[in-house]
Amino acid sequence: MKSLGICLGASTVSMVQAAQENTSGTERPRVIDFSRHPHDGNPKKTLLSVLNSLDLTSFDRIAATGRKFRKFINLSSISEPESVEHAYGYVKRQGISCPAIVSAGGETFMVYVLD
């Protein structure tokens, strides 16, 4: 299964492509590619430009996140805290205890306290 994650931020459009060969849940997805694109105040133009450079039919899932701009597109979306929590589950290394995650964006600085 191949997935595309899009973050529509205050100053950039970021994307990550991930793949998971075994969908039974025993294998973690692996990052295939990622990119960041400054949108200079025009996230729609930047998003369309980046999407036009991809073969969207090659993705089984596409989802977007972002505080404000994700609400203006017709894609499945999740909140930033939910996406951060989900992603952290895949990148956390065993034996590492992390009390919080910092999300430092173009306009918003957030600290997510983990329990």
Question: Which residues does each predicted region cover?
Answer:
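Gly/Thr-rich phosphate-binding beta-strand-loop-beta motif of the actin/hexokinase/Hsp70
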Residues: 1-27, 98-115
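Short amphipathic alpha-helices and their capping/turn segments at secondary-structure boundaries
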Residues: 3, 52-54, 92
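Short secondary-structure boundary/capping segments within folded domains
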Residues: 5-7, 54-55, 61
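Electropositive phosphate-/nucleotide-binding environments in soluble metabolic enzymes
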Residues: 9-12, 40-45, 78, 82
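N-terminal cofactor/phosphate-binding cores enriched in small/glycine residues
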Residues: 15, 30, 50-51, 61-67, ...
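N-terminal phosphate-binding loop and adjacent alpha-helix
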Residues: 26-58, 69
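Local beta-strand N-terminus motif with an aromatic residue
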Residues: 58-60, 97-98
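Conserved phosphate-binding catalytic cores of ATP/NTP-utilizing and phosphoryl-transfer enzymes
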Residues: 68-115
